[in-house]
C-alpha cells in the first residue's frame, strides 16, 4: 500500500509460485525465474531417494552454465531474436535466470520457462564446459579484490560450504559429471522450489493464461520437501589472520566478523539486516562525521566499505578497504569494534538516515531490475520486498544498539592482500 503497487500472485497446480507486477508507462519488461538452490546446497537427499548424498562444490554454478543449451540452439540467441537480452547468476543460496525486453514480452516469458524447465546435456557438452569454468575460476583467483573479499569470508568458517568459492575449484569442476548435474536438476529445479517474477509492460490476466498453458503441457514428479544437511559449524573462526602476496598498487584489508546467531524468524531476520544497514549508513556514509574524520586523518580512502550479509544459515560482517599502511587500517577497525558501544546515536541523525533509506527503497521501484532482484532475494527468506519500507519505518535506535553486540573481536578475522615489493 505504501508503494501503491498491485502485485498479482498465483500458485499453479504444479507448485510454481508466479508473481506479476504491471508497471503502467514502463517500456521495459524484466522476467526472473529463480530456484532455491545455490552453491551451499551440496549435501541433500535427491528427489525420489532416501539417502543423503554429497555432490561436488560449484555444481549449482556448473548447472547454470549448462541450462542455456537447448536441443535446437542456445537460449541466449533465441532471446536475441526476440529483441531481448538474457543472463543468469548463482549465489550461495539461489540460481536465477532472467531476461530484459521492450518487445515480445509473452514470448520471452515462455522461452524463459522452456529453457529453464528442460535440461539438454551430453557427456561431451559437460566435458567441454569444464575448461570454460576453470578459466573463469582462474580469472577470479587473479583478481585481488575478489581474493580479499572471498578470503575474508572463507577465514571465518571451518565446515560451512560458504567458505568455498561459488564456482568451486578446478578439481571439483573436473569431477562433475552429467548424472550428477541431472540429479541436482531434478531435485532443485522442481516447480515447487522455484518462483517466477515478471515486472513491467505486461497484461497480468493475459500473461497468467500463457504461463498456465505452458505449465499444463509439462509433466513433473510429485513434489516433496527438500532435505538439506544441517551444517554443524563451530562458533570460533577458522583462521584469525591471513596474508596473500599479489601484484597490487595498494595493500587491501578486510576484517570479517562471524555472526553465530542464525535467526529463523523472517521478521526478526529482516529487522536485524535493516538495523545493520542503517547503523553502517550512520557511521560510514559519505556525510557521516566518523567517516570524514577517518578520511581526513588518512586512516581510510574512498575504497572503504562496511556491510552485513545474512543468508539461509550463515551471517557475517565485512569492514575494510585499500590502505598502504594496512596495520593502521586494521587498528582503526579493531578500535571501532571495541568502542562501538561508546558511539552514541543521535535521534536527529537516525531519523535522517531512515528517511534517506526509505527514499532509496521507493526510488528503486522505478527500476524493473531492482524490483525483480530485490523480490527474488527476499522471497526465499519468507519476506516480501514490498514491505521493506514498512519494516524500516518501524526500526528504532534501540534496534541499532542491539546489533552492536555482534561486533566481537573474538569472532573477528583479518585477510590482507599485500603488494609484492
Place the predicted regions along the sequence by residue.
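His/Glu-rich zincin catalytic helix
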Residues: 1-74, 185, 189-293, 412-421
Amino acid at each position: 500500500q505504501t508503494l501503491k503497487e498491485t502485485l498479482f500472485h498465483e500458485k499453479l497446480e504444479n507448485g510454481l509460485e508466479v508473481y506479476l507486477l504491471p508497471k503502467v508507462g514502463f517500456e521495459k519488461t524484466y522476467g526472473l525465474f529463480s530456484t532455491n538452490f545455490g552453491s551451499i546446497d551440496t549435501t541433500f537427499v535427491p528427489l525420489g531417494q532416501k539417502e543423503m548424498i554429497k555432490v561436488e562444490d560449484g555444481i549449482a554454478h556448473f548447472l547454470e552454465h549448462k541450462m542455456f543449451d537447448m536441443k535446437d540452439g542456445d537460449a541466449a540467441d533465441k532471446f536475441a531474436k526476440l529483441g531481448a537480452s538474457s543472463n543468469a547468476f548463482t549465489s550461495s543460496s539461489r540460481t536465477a535466470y532472467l531476461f530484459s525486453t521492450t518487445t515480445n514480452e509473452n514470448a520471452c516469458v515462455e522461452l524463459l520457462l522452456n529453457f529453464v524447465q528442460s535440461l539438454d546435456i551430453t557427456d561431451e557438452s559437460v566435458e567441454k564446459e569444464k575448461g570454460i569454468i576453470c578459466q573463469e575460476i582462474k580469472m577470479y583467483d587473479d583478481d585481488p579484490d575478489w581474493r580479499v573479499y572471498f578470503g575474508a569470508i572463507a577465514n571465518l568458517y571451518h565446515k560451512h560450504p560458504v567458505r568455498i568459492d561459488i564456482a568451486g575449484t578446478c578439481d571439483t569442476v573436473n569431477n562433475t559429471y552429467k548424472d550428477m548435474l541431472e540429479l541436482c536438476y531434478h531435485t532443485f529445479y522442481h516447480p515447487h522450489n522455484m518462483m517466477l517474477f515478471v515486472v513491467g509492460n505486461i497484461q497480468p490476466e493475459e500473461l497468467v493464461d500463457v504461463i498456465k498453458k505452458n505449465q499444463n503441457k509439462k509433466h513433473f514428479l510429485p513434489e516433496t520437501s527438500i532435505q538439506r544437511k544441517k551444517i554443524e559449524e563451530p562458533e570460533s573462526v577458522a583462521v584469525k589472520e591471513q596474508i596473500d602476496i599479489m601484484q597490487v598498487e595498494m595493500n587491501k584489508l578486510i576484517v570479517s566478523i562471524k555472526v553465530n546467531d542464525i535467526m529463523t524468524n523472517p521478521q526478526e531476520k529482516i529487522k536485524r539486516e535493516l538495523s545493520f544497514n542503517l547503523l553502517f549508513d550512520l557511521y560510514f556514509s559519505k556525510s557521516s562525521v566518523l567517516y570524514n574524520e577517518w578520511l581526513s586523518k588518512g586512516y581510510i580512502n574512498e575504497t572503504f566499505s562496511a556491510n552485513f550479509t545474512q543468508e539461509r544459515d550463515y551471517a557475517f560482517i565485512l569492514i575494510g578497504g585499500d590502505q598502504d599502511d594496512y596495520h593502521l587500517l586494521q587498528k582503526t577497525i579493531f578500535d571501532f569494534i571495541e568502542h562501538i558501544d561508546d558511539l552514541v546515536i543521535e535521534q536527529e541523525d537516525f531519523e535522517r538516515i531512515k528517511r534517506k533509506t526509505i527514499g532509496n527503497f521507493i526510488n528503486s521501484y522505478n527500476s524493473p531490475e531492482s524490483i525483480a532482484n530485490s523480490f527474488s532475494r527476499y522471497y526465499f527468506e519468507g519476506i516480501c520486498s514490498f514491505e521493506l519500507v514498512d519494516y524500516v519505518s518501524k526500526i528504532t535506535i534501540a534496534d541499532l544498539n542491539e546489533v552492536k553486540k555482534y561486533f566481537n573481536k573474538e569472532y573477528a578475522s583479518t585477510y590482507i592482500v599485500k603488494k609484492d615489493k
